[in-house]
Amino acid sequence: MQLTPHEQERLLIHVAADVAEKRRARGLKLNHPEAVALITSHILEGARDGRTVAELMSSGRKLLTRDDVMEGIPEMIHDVQVEATFPDGTKLVTVHDPIV
């Protein structure tokens, strides 16, 4: 399988998000990379599904709570920015303060 660097990066994000989701399902608190991967994957998949930027900005803030992540992680993640491909082109999605 021949993947471009961009495709490799997206695949790595989805694998990391899958690991994070499995850990969360087992009751483990997520670390910084796991939390960011989960939010990023949510945005990428939502864009692929045809959701709007506004919908993804809103739902990205509801994905994780302080109870889902290790102590101090919410303060470390101020914004998550993802360049996602929507049906009408590529757009930058920014989720401000994604963990409340």
Curated annotation (Swiss-Prot):
Gene Ontology CC annotations of this record: cytoplasm
- Do you know which SUPFAM superfamilies this protein is assigned to? Urease, gamma-subunit (SSF54111)
PANTHER family given in the database record: UREASE
Which top-rank group of organisms is this from? Answer: Bacteria
The organism is Streptomyces avermitilis (strain ATCC 31267 / DSM 46492 / JCM 5070 / NBRC 14893 / NCIMB 12804 / NRRL 8165 / MA-4680)
Q: In which pathway does it act?
A: Nitrogen metabolism; urea degradation; CO(2) and NH(3) from urea (urease route): step 1/1
From the UniProt record, report the name of the gene that encodes this protein.
Answer: ureA
Q: Which Pfam families match?
A: Urease_gamma (PF00547)
InterPro entries attached to this UniProt entry: Urease_gamma, Urease_gamma/gamma-beta_su, Urease_gamma_sf, Urease_subunit
What is the E.C. number?
A: 3.5.1.5
| GO MF annotation: an example | urease activity
Q: Which reaction does it catalyse?
A: urea + 2 H2O + H(+) = hydrogencarbonate + 2 NH4(+)
Q: Where in the cell is it found?
A: Cytoplasm
> Would you tell me the protein name for this molecule?
Urease subunit gamma
Q: Subunit comment for this entry? A: Heterotrimer of UreA (gamma), UreB (beta) and UreC (alpha) subunits. Three heterotrimers associate to form the active enzyme.
Q: Which UniProt keywords apply?
A: Cytoplasm, Hydrolase
* GO process annotations (BP): urea catabolic process
Q: Which family does this protein fall into?
A: Belongs to the urease gamma subunit family.
Give the primary localization class: cytoplasm
